[in-house]
Amino acid sequence: MKISRQAYADMFGPTVGDRVRLADTDLWIEVERDFTVYGEEVKFGGGKVIRDGMGQSQLGAAQVVDTVITNALILDHWGVVKADVGLKDGRIQAIGKAGNPDIQPGVNIAIGAGTEVIAGEGMILTAGGIDTHIHFICPQQIEEALMSGVTTMIGGGTGPAAGTNATTCTSGPWHMARMLQAADAFPMNIGFTGKGNASLPLPLEEQVLAGAIGLKLHEDWGSTPAAIDNCLEVAERHDIQVAIHTDTLNESGFVETTLGAFKGRTIHTYHTEGAGGGHAPDIIKACGFANVLPSSTNPTRPFTRNTIDEHLDMLMVCHHLDPAIAEDVAFAESRIRRETIAAEDILHDLGAFSMISSDSQAMGRVGEVITRTWQTADKMKRQRGRLDGDGARNDNFRARRYIAKYTINPAITHGISHEVGSVEAGKWADLVLWRPAFFGVKPSLILKGGAIAASLMGDINGSIPTPQPVHYRPMFASYAGSRHATSLTFVSQAAFAAGVPQQLGLRKAIGVVSGCRGVQKTDLIHNGYLPTIEVDAQNYQVRADGQLLWCEPADVLPMAQRYFLF
């Protein structure tokens, strides 16, 4: 029996050789491999395959998966494949072929009466996003991020205090305890960073022992060489990550001074281009060092005709500056440079910048990490053409490079890749399903720990779930004990060993960070390029390995007005 490609795709989703457009971008992914078996595909519904004695076996709950996502198109750092995905006990059990092993060939995901079915036909499946630059200014950020496809948030803060409005620091053991307790309320994986600005170990170690999974150095607290050295020394002892916002004013030294203070030790440099803060005008040089793990924040992603104009006001508010004070205005203007922002686009496309995050409500938009990542990818394809690793008919390599920037690479950087960050067997089942036309913009279904935490949902009084108005709503995994079983609170090894989760009465599952200190930039997948960066101090032009980096700002972006009223 034969069936046309179009009919097959309509029924079971695309297969090998089919291409799928990502939203309204110029990015196309092509199916590289299909793990399902032609003629033996499983699908749920009236007259379909997943019925008793057909695609559903007689096996008990212990031998079948809890949930199967059928015929999904998986996009992850490791490839673009069509497969069924089996979930068991909150984790991804297997990727492959689902069905009834008694009568079907090649089944490695058994379906039984104890199995729920999520229809993945015609859908793109990705890992949940990881945002590692969160100012915990208000709890409502968490729902906004979740509805955008982000399932892990790392950062610091205590609410709308001046310190939190500017820095991602949960300062001190008392505040750390309160924030860890608050994290129980949310269907989101959460880890908190403490304040790293101190020149002696005690106040930093207290925060690590209280549960901090990392320490944040910020210029507003004084990112001096002494503070940097001490903070990294504490991190080395406790296997946690350090994030840094460097000294824009070059008061305690220049970029070379800060790089020297690192002493070759691993560090995550926030907004490494500099508009979000850092040595003016050349913090961007840091992306060329093996121990530096560089990220961007999303307001400069990508470079558009509006980017420069909006940044000045943002900066004045976020860093408690006064527009009536000339020195404050000069400080702000020193950070906003067309040339380095343009270079940032290209450095992402080359894989020299490795991650993208939000800088939520503090010069960044918590719900736009994923959208702005793909807007950057589209802009770069239109301006720079295909990448060397792409096929003649697809942008698979570029897609894998860019999705790694907000999934696996942040997970590796912050020591949580053993739990989250990719669609791989054994990992926490934090997964997002997208209709291709809405990919990267509006997810259809968000799973946390194998259960549905959020979804588009129609009129609650409708006779079916689809009538308008359709908007995002929390689902059952967002409530009560279910959220405790399906979301993680991350803590340091020291805090876990000391019994901090029990002492605080935490109810969520606990994840423990590890492997932070040995990470090198070359470990960051598809994003490990180490260029030699030069910045002209007079005109701010940027060169990488001698090549001038410049691109025009975009006048129009995809994933924008077609999808949003505002």
Swiss-Prot record:
Its cofactor is Ni cation. Carboxylation allows a single lysine to coordinate two nickel ions. Ni(2+) 2 binds at residues 216, 245, 271. InterPro entries: Amidohydro-rel, Metal-dep_hydrolase_composite, Metal_Hydrolase, Urease_alpha_N_dom, Urease_alpha_subunit, Urease_AS, Urease_asu, Urease_asu_c. Keywords: Cytoplasm, Hydrolase, Metal-binding, Nickel. One of its GO terms (cellular component) is cytoplasm. Binds 2 nickel ions per subunit. GO terms for biological process: urea catabolic process. Its EC number is 3.5.1.5. It catalyses: urea + 2 H2O + H(+) = hydrogencarbonate + 2 NH4(+). Pathway: Nitrogen metabolism; urea degradation; CO(2) and NH(3) from urea (urease route): step 1/1. The modification N6-carboxylysine is found at residue 216. It is an enzyme of class 3 (hydrolase). One of its GO terms (molecular function) is nickel cation binding. Residues 128-566 form the Urease domain. The active site is at residue 319. Its main location: cytoplasm. Substrate binds at residue 218. Ni(2+) 1 binds at residues 133, 135, 216, 359. It comes from the Bacteria. It is found in: Cytoplasm. Belongs to the metallo-dependent hydrolases superfamily. Urease alpha subunit family. Heterotrimer of UreA (gamma), UreB (beta) and UreC (alpha) subunits. Three heterotrimers associate to form the active enzyme. This is Urease subunit alpha. It comes from Pseudomonas aeruginosa (strain ATCC 15692 / DSM 22644 / CIP 104116 / JCM 14847 / LMG 12228 / 1C / PRS 101 / PAO1). The lineage of its organism: Bacteria, Pseudomonadati, Pseudomonadota, Gammaproteobacteria, Pseudomonadales. The gene is ureC.
